[in-house]
């Protein structure tokens, strides 16, 4: 049996890039909660003792940007300079302007267009992917890397491993078998965890705790064997972390946010963007389409692409590839998808309820992945049953 190795990585909510994603989405939530028609393009950057939010926001909402920045950093665990940032003492810079009137008239006619007339907020192409290798219909390498990161945060916050600090990265290599285009995981080849820690803990304690409290609860035993390789804090020391260790920027972790390197990516980031930004809404609707294709048994694995022009509601193209796993021809699946899904941005916002903020709705997406999550707020994960109409004889 010929197998191959494939690797996916993830980062924790305390990674500086992910801190920025969460701040941007916390601001989006606050705007949408008060004004569902808010137009938000919010970027965040951070370095030692500083967080800056900048971009274009047009909203009727009354939003205290500085307060949101500090509370988001605090809830992640950045409560002192020792851990990489002090949420209460750091400098918060704000440079937010209104959306360009040129863009506003072209996309939504200064809020006068009906939902079906709203144009795409920009050009671009987005991909959705699904695979039957996990219950989530997501790639196993990505699922395991993501869950390891989430578990690291859990044992830090609940006190199981008090030596942990907010920053951290994970990476999982899975050995796969290609079964006529479908991906079948055989075993976990390598597990890598690099986590920020305090001064008190030894490398042996770190390795023992990570194996017992992080890896064991996350990776099913059937995937681990005596040949599985573990790299646990291989650099030997990771005390300085968060924005003190590295600069952070919104939209720098787009593969972690999506499919861990599987499928394809159009390059557009998600966080800090309202649903007229097709980078986000377009990617969400094609995930729903791809997941629905696999969940409905039309294929074992598939990718869906959609593309847009600024100001134009209808997509320029829709593409489906089932990697040879389709039960019916890809062309037929494409026709079903085009019939069952409305790819116009204004209609995506309605069908996936994307104008609803609050309750950390989008903040939740900004760490540990936008897809494969079991949460009613992740409306794009709801499967639409798809059936092939048998052609008339």
From Swiss-Prot:
Protein name: S-adenosylmethionine synthase 2
Keyword Nucleotide-binding set for record: yes
The keyword Protein biosynthesis appears for this protein: no
HAMAP family in alphabetical order: S_AdoMet_synth1 (MF_00086)
Annotated residues for binding of L-methionine: 56, 99, 246, 277
Gene Ontology MF terms: ATP binding; metal ion binding; methionine adenosyltransferase activity
This protein's pathway: Amino-acid biosynthesis; S-adenosyl-L-methionine biosynthesis; S-adenosyl-L-methionine from L-methionine: step 1/1
